[in-house]
Amino acid sequence: MALVVKDIVKNFGEGLSETKVLKGINFEVEQGEFVILNGASGSGKTTLLTILGGLLSQTSGTVLYNDAPLFDKQHRSSDLRLEDIGFIFQSSHLVPYLKVIEQLTLVGQEAGMTKQQSSKRAIQLLKNIGLEDRLNVYPHQLSGGEKQRVAIMRAFMNNPKIILADEPTASLDADRATKVVEMIRQQIKEQQMIGIMITHDRRLFEYADRVIELEDGKITD
């Protein structure tokens, strides 16, 4: 299975005020592959990621998953749901009144897991990041790095088929950033997901299978 991006164009506005943000984007990402998107501010990275996540419609072009359109106008496809896409953002966006374990279990239950299944998976994921002793604390009791690790495991909670990450390490120091990207890569490889991450940090490029460079809405050679 692969994610295939064909001739994606995105314009904002109309007439004289129209801005062309994406200008014919083409690439493929295979199952189990971890790809980094890089480019200057305004190059179209976040717009592209938002389209891939089904949160924004392209002006023209097609995104295919397993040879079928990723989303139609109702944001549905034959074999992929919005729940099958995991998002990781620069900020953790944890729910302040939920304990760490609950941040994950609620995601699992919403995806159809039983309470027991959800709890078992959440504990295992939190063990993987060394937070098994923090299950019952609240977000304000966590460090910035711990919050981001919880947010990342939350994205993997329901075994998504695609992971989209937008600058998930921007607020972290070099050591923590490396650990976060290693963690993301490991999950993508182990679960054979499709992973796409935006980052400006060239030190992290070595963890990607491939780096796609965007400039002025186009992929550079």
Swiss-Prot record:
The keyword Acyltransferase does not apply. Its EC number is 7.6.2.-. One of its GO terms (molecular function) is ATP hydrolysis activity. One of its GO terms (cellular component) is plasma membrane. The keyword Nucleotide-binding applies. It holds the Pfam family ABC_tran. ATP binds at G39, A40, S41, G42, S43, G44, K45, T46. It is found in: Cell membrane. This is Putative hemin import ATP-binding protein HrtA. It comes from Staphylococcus aureus (strain MRSA252).
